[in-house]
């Protein structure tokens, strides 16, 4: 069975955000606005997305 994936796109800037949230974006592999990455849909990744949900858009 194929692993589930989720597409995450950064839609807001990380300038002026908490250092922890900037680090979370880097951990997700996001570098700039409109940058999209495809990640495995795991509890760890979902937790990171939840932490920076105000800066990202999630599909899938």
UniProtKB/Swiss-Prot annotation:
One of its GO terms (molecular function) is structural constituent of ribosome. Disulfide bonds: none annotated. PROSITE patterns: RIBOSOMAL_L30. PANTHER family: LARGE RIBOSOMAL SUBUNIT PROTEIN UL30M, MITOCHONDRIAL RIBOSOMAL PROTEIN L30. InterPro entries: Ribo_uL30_ferredoxin-like_sf, Ribosomal_uL30_bac-type, Ribosomal_uL30_CS, Ribosomal_uL30_ferredoxin-like. One of its GO terms (cellular component) is cytosolic large ribosomal subunit. This is Large ribosomal subunit protein uL30. Keywords: Ribonucleoprotein, Ribosomal protein.
């Amino acid at each position: 069975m194929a692993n589930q994936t989720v597409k995450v796109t950064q839609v807001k800037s990380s300038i002026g955000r908490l250092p922890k949230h900037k680090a979370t974006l880097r951990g997700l592999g996001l570098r700039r606005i409109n940058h999209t990455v495809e990640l495995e849909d795991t509890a760890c990744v979902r937790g990171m997305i939840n932490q920076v949900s105000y800066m990202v858009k999630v599909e899938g």
